[in-house]
A protein has these predicted regions:
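Residues in and immediately flanking transmembrane alpha helices
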Residues: 15, 20-26, 123, 183
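N-terminal cationic leader/targeting segments used for protein routing and processing
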Residues: 8-14, 27, 31-33, 44
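Short N-terminal signal/transit or membrane-insertion segments
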Residues: 33-51, 55, 94-106, 157-158
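Short, intrinsically disordered low-complexity segments enriched in Ser/Thr with adjacent Pro
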Residues: 4-12, 18-21
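Polybasic, low-complexity association/targeting segments
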Residues: 37-79
C-alpha cells in the first residue's frame, strides 16, 4: 500500500458548540463555530466538540448549507422530545478530532453509530474500554487474526487506529437510543459524502473501505 504522509498545515482546533437554548440558530465562522440546538428551554446545556482546523478548511461551507440547518433542526426536535442520542454530543465529531485531514491514510466507513447504552464513541465500530465488544467488531478482529495473524484484542477501543491516520467514519453520525438507522436520511449522509469527496479530490493514495 502506498501512503502519502503530508505535514499538518495548522494544528489549531475549531470548536463546534452544540447547545440547548431558546435563541435558536447562531453560526459564527471565527475561531469558534456555534451550532445552537433549541430544546425549548432557557437552560444552557452545551458541550464543546473539537474539529481540527485542517478539516474546517475542507468542509466549512457545509455549516451554512440548507441541508445542514435542517439536520440541526431535526436534532433540536429530538432533544426537545427528550430523546436520547448517541454518541454523546462531545463525541459526535470524534473522528475528525482524532484524525486530521492532512493525516488521513485510510477511510473506514460504517453505517451509523451503535445504539446501545454506552457503546458509541464517535468512531465507527469502536467502543470505550470496559464496554463489551459488539459482534461487528468481533468479526473485524477475527478477520485481522485470520488474514494477518494479528492477536485479537481484549478491548474494542479503536482510537489508536484513528491516531495513525485511519478515519473511522459513520455515514450517519448520530442515532436515537435503541433505534438503529433512526437518524438516516436526515442530512448526515450529505455531510459525509462531502467529506469523502474532499478526501478523494485532495488527498493522494488514500484507501477506502466500506464496511457499513
Amino acid at each position: 500500500m502506498h501512503v502519502f504522509t503530508g505535514n499538518m498545515i495548522n494544528q489549531h482546533k475549531v470548536s463546534i458548540f452544540i447547545s440547548r437554548t431558546e435563541d435558536g440558530f447562531n453560526y459564527f465562522s471565527h475561531d469558534k463555530l456555534f451550532i445552537m440546538l433549541d430544546a425549548a428551554t432557557d437552560k444552557m446545556d452545551g458541550l464543546n466538540v473539537n474539529i481540527e482546523e485542517s478539516w474546517n478548511k475542507q468542509i466549512a461551507n457545509e455549516w451554512e448549507g440548507p441541508y445542514f440547518k435542517e439536520l440541526v433542526q431535526f436534532l433540536r426536535a429530538e432533544l426537545a422530545n427528550n430523546e436520547i442520542i448517541y454518541p454523546p454530543r462531545e463525541q459526535i465529531f470524534a473522528a475528525f478530532e482524532n484524525t486530521p485531514f492532512d493525516q488521513v491514510k485510510v477511510v473506514i466507513i460504517g453505517q451509523d453509530p451503535y445504539h446501545g447504552i454506552g457503546q458509541a464513541n464517535g468512531l465507527c465500530f469502536s467502543v470505550a474500554p470496559g464496554v463489551r465488544i459488539p459482534p461487528s467488531l468481533k468479526n473485524i478482529f477475527k478477520e485481522l487474526n485470520r488474514d494477518l495473524g494479528i492477536e485479537i484484542p481484549q478491548l474494542g477501543e479503536l482510537s489508536p487506529w484513528s491516531k495513525q491516520g485511519v478515519l473511522l467514519l459513520n455515514a450517519t453520525l448520530t442515532v436515537r437510543a435503541n433505534q438503529a438507522g433512526s437518524h438516516q436520511n436526515k442530512g448526515w449522509e450529505k455531510f459525509t459524502d462531502v467529506v469523502i469527496k474532499s478526501i478523494s479530490e485532495n488527498r493522494e493514495h488514500v484507501v477506502f473501505m466500506l464496511w457499513g
